[in-house]
């Protein structure tokens, strides 16, 4: 579980870094189609948030913490849905979700979670498949890194220095 705690902390730090850098971009730069899976930086950041809400819900067996401005739970209808229209709001919820993910990994370690426990995963076609907790956690952190890598590539193409992304150097920064 120590590895998953490390990944959760790394993701929290990288997400904070990416939102800080993206906060310097104008709306046009955030929303321009860049040819990645979800088109733009903004849509990619929303997609990562949706996936994290889903996985947090599955692993903790608790409702997703994502909510609207009135505090009502957000209904997630698709993996490319725009959850929040403003980057500041998305960033606020990103911080909350990242803290919850770190807390979730720490709780799993504390309770010596059974990594062979099966989780149900509903596919977009409605069918249900099962994965072990271990495989689900590996997928979850790989998914974040994969899509965040798309965003850092776009930033690099815009000649914006994102900074160090090496996990080994995380604690030095």
Task: State where each predicted segment sits.
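Short, contiguous alpha-helical
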Residues: 5-20, 29-77, 122-173
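Acidic catalytic patch
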Residues: 107-124
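Helix-adjacent hinge/juxtasegments
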Residues: 65-111
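Absolute protein N-terminus
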Residues: 1-2
């Amino acid at each position: 579980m120590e590895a998953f705690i490390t990944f959760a902390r790394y993701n929290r730090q990288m997400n904070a870094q990416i939102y800080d850098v993206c906060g310097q971009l104008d709306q046009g730069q955030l929303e321009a189609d860049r040819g990645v899976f979800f088109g733009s930086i903004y849509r990619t950041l929303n997609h990562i948030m949706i996936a994290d809400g889903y996985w947090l819900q599955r692993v903790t067996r608790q409702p997703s913490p994502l909510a609207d401005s009135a505090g009502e739970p957000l209904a997630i209808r698709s993996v490319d849905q725009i959850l929040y229209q403003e980057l500041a709001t998305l960033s606020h919820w990103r911080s909350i979700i990242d803290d919850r993910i770190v807390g979730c990994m720490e709780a799993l370690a504390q309770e010596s979670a059974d990594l062979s426990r099966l989780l149900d995963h509903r596919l977009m076609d409605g069918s249900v498949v099962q994965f072990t907790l271990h495989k689900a956690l590996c997928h979850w952190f790989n998914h974040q890194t994969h899509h965040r890598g798309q965003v850092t590539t776009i930033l690099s193409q815009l000649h914006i220095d994102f900074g160090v992304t090496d996990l080994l150097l995380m604690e030095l920064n």
